[in-house]
Amino acid sequence: MVKKMEIARILLKIVMWILIVGFGCNFILQTISYSFYKGAKKMTNLVCMPQYIQMTDALTGYGHNLDRDSDKIILFFGGSNYVAYNSVGKYANRFACPFISVDYYGTQDSKGKMNLSSMQRSALDLYDWAKQQYPQSEIIIMGHSYGTGIATYLASERKCKTLILAAGYRDISDLYNKIIPIFWGPFKVFISNNICTKEYAKAVDSSVYIIGSKKDKTLNADLQKKLVTCFENAEIKIFDDIAHEDYFVTESVIGYIHQVIE
């Protein structure tokens, strides 16, 4: 009897520590991920000046070429530190059409609390605002790194012509495991606010293009080859020598994007 109780205590301690480690690591990694958007500073080495947009009373963003007459617009979701101001200021001048990015609720000047639900609502509200402003334009959704998940969510919920993902992931564990590699199999249950790109992908009916690079050490080319299988109809383009942050400043990538959106 004593031996059984001792075994039970040991098992309870193991379970307790698994719970502490699992939920604790999730909290730490989510806090870090969100801090890249909440605390991101405006970059100074921009190639164009972003224009401030008040989309709703609580939601803000930035854009470029907002008055440009075009049959298409781009909605862009940036990766870590690439809040709306930085995404537009670094990338928008490479496209001759309205280029718009949103700051998720609870980040930058957007009010509220940042979580999965509010990120999804930010994307939907961005789309609805853009559709009202440009009712005749086709919508192209682009995402990079962390932003590819919400970009895919939006494409699964709203009609768009094209979805372009650079350095994407299947769910947030692909990112978390780069830092603390514990979220495998059943241990994914500890992840809260999981951005499940592979689930959103099932409902995407637009053209999908996935871009990766053999030089990308953050979300590598092999991961992009796995991600493309999550979509019913997607093409993949793997470049040889592009670092993780350089996709949208590299001429070969920009040329490829222009080719697929024309």
How should each PLM-predicted stretch be described?
Residues I242-S252:
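Catalytic histidine-centered segment of alpha/beta-hydrolase-like enzymes
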Residues V204, Y209-G212, D216:
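Short beta-strand/loop motif that positions the catalytic acidic residue
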Residues V88-G89, T197, S206, N220-T229:
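Short alpha-helix in the alpha/beta-hydrolase fold that links the catalytic acid
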Residues T148-Y200:
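Hydrolase active-site cap/lid region
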Residues A8-H64:
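An N-terminal hydrophobic leader/cap segment in hydrolases
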Residues Y134-S145:
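Alpha/beta-hydrolase fold nucleophile elbow
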Residues A58-W129, M142, G149:
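Membrane-embedded segments
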Residues K214-L219, H244-E245:
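Acidic catalytic loop of the alpha/beta-hydrolase fold
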